[in-house]
Amino acid sequence: MVKSLHCLIGIVLFLAILNAGNGFTLDRSASIERQEDSWPKISLFHGNQRKNDLKKSVSPTWNKLSRCPVYLPTKSDTIRVVQIKGYFAEKKQTIITSYCIIK
């Protein structure tokens, strides 16, 4: 019984570490299109206006927790989603609160 409990706790901790990932927090509204390689693609919206012209910041700021540079993703950037706040089915929109740009 005790060994089973320790094993279960170990598995849960292992999965939690796998899911944690590296990311920085930046609140943005985004829609996700699933790619074949399972990395999500992000398209940023501001109201009804699609933000095609987002540029990466010239001098990135650094998040103290994750050590990830804070860039604004462009339409063509591929990102790894780390944390999702909620999904709105009627708008097919997801609020992503943490992500990393994949280079």
UniProtKB/Swiss-Prot annotation:
<dbReference type="GO" id="GO:0090729">
    <property type="term" value="F:toxin activity"/>
</dbReference>
<keyword id="KW-1015">Disulfide bond</keyword>
<protein>
    <recommendedName>
        <fullName>U-scoloptoxin(24)-Er1a</fullName>
    </recommendedName>
</protein>
<dbReference type="GO" id="GO:0005576">
    <property type="term" value="C:extracellular region"/>
</dbReference>
<keyword id="KW-0732">Signal</keyword>
<keyword id="KW-0964">Secreted</keyword>
<keyword id="KW-0800">Toxin</keyword>
<feature type="signal peptide">
    <location>
        <begin position="1"/>
        <end position="23"/>
    </location>
</feature>
<comment type="similarity">
    <text>Belongs to the scoloptoxin-24 family.</text>
</comment>
